[in-house]
Curated annotation (Swiss-Prot):
Protein's cellular compartments: Cytoplasm
Location of region: S2 site: 286-291
Pfam entry (one): OTU
Catalyzed reaction equations: Thiol-dependent hydrolysis of ester, thioester, amide, peptide and isopeptide bonds formed by the C-terminal Gly of ubiquitin (a 76-residue protein attached to proteins as an intracellular targeting signal)
First and last residues of each zinc finger (C2H2-type): 313-337
Protein name: Ubiquitin thioesterase OTU1
Residue ranges of the region described as UBX-like: 45-123
Length: 343
């Protein structure tokens, strides 16, 4: 989970908090409290007869069997026939204990693994090939998935909490996160002006505290700064990624998926049941962005999105029918009504 934030169980600031992150604390919010470093994603390549490949989803906690499963899927060399060499001069890894973690092997991020087929061992079945790996190998690869959170007007806050806390689903966090955002905005009326917020600073703070309002780009930007991480939102309608905090130099990245009206968190699941899902990624892990776009494209092809310019809404206060977010915005401006439901 994200550790350095102070004042509450997930980072609500104490009284008098200015909204700015002290320079001395930069870099502490993205790792666990205490001396144990965060388990970051490794960048490891493997070189085999067919070329050089980047391996996905590895860390010090990855088990050798998962590494060999990836290599098998990429190279077509079955785990039992692999020879893996590392270092200079290259030395063979001991592959006898397939449950050992990479952190206990002489491998580190940035290494190039040389993979060869051990000719002294029985060859794999002809059915085992680079593009036809057996199902057990395909299943051994980590997969990026979405986790559904309640559609209760606070899905953004629940989703952000889920990813920064390492996979904790707690919809009850929303009021606290809303108060956090209001306190940060109120602390800097110059930065968070009416031109930015679309309403006065005071009105915005009252508005965001309510449980019937939706979060969006402003709130994501604030949470990105507070948690000192890049928040990437992949849009299933346009199949694009909006990256908040991209240029801030953060070392961590979390991902949400957005269908036009609802946010869900994304996580990487591993086949080993003892390996917890990963929700916090290295900002250098661009593979996870590709995987997120693949998820979004699949959802778009299945039309799992809401066109916010054409969807039908009803004002839950006066029951007036509306079409699209523009009409809803105009209605809210004219009447002060902000509680809408999709028809």
């Amino acid at each position: 989970m994200f550790g350095g934030a102070k004042g509450g169980h997930f980072g609500v600031p104490p009284a008098g908090y200015s909204g700015a992150v002290p320079q001395s604390e930069a870099g502490t919010k993205a790792g666990p409290a205490g001396g144990r470093p965060a388990d970051t994603m490794w960048r490891v390549r493997c070189k085999a007869k067919g070329g050089t490949h980047l391996l996905q989803g590895l860390s010090s906690r990855t088990r050798l069997r998962e590494l060999q499963g990836q290599i098998a899927a990429i190279t077509g060399i079955a785990p039992g026939s692999q020879r893996i060499l590392v270092g200079y001069p290259p030395e063979c890894l001991d592959l006898s204990d397939r449950d050992i973690t990479l952190g206990d092997l002489p491998i580190q991020s940035g290494d190039m693994l040389i993979v060869e087929e051990d000719q002294t061992r029985p060859k794999a079945s002809p059915a085992f090939s680079k593009y036809g790996a057996p199902s057990y190998v395909r299943e051994a690869l980590p997969v990026l998935t979405r986790t559904a959170v309640p559609a209760d007007n606070s899905c953004l806050f629940t989703s952000v909490y889920y990813v920064v806390e390492g996979g904790v689903l707690n919809p009850a966090c929303a009021p606290e996160m809303r108060r956090l955002i209001a306190q940060i905005v109120a602390s800097d009326p110059v930065l968070y002006s009416e031109a930015i917020l679309g309403k006065t600073n005071e009105d915005y703070c009252d508005w965001i505290r309510r449980d019937d309002t939706w979060g969006g780009a402003i709130e994501i930007s604030i949470l990105s700064k507070f948690y000192q991480c890049e928040i990437c939102v992949v849009d299933t309608q346009t199949v694009r990624i909006d990256r908040f905090g991209e240029d801030a130099g953060y070392t961590k990245r979390v991902l949400l998926i957005y269908d036009g009206i609802h946010y869900d968190p994304l996580q990487r699941n591993f086949p080993d049941p003892d390996t917890p899902p990963l929700t916090i990624f290295s900002s250098n892990d661009d593979i996870v962005l590709v995987q997120a776009l693949e998820l979004a494209d699949e959802a778009r092809r299945k039309r799992q999105f809401t066109d916010v310019n054409r969807f039908t809404l009803r004002c839950m206060i006066c029951q007036k029918g509306l079409t699209g977010q523009a009409e809803a915005r105009d209605h809210a401006r004219e009447t002060g009504h902000t509680n809408f439901g999709e028809v």
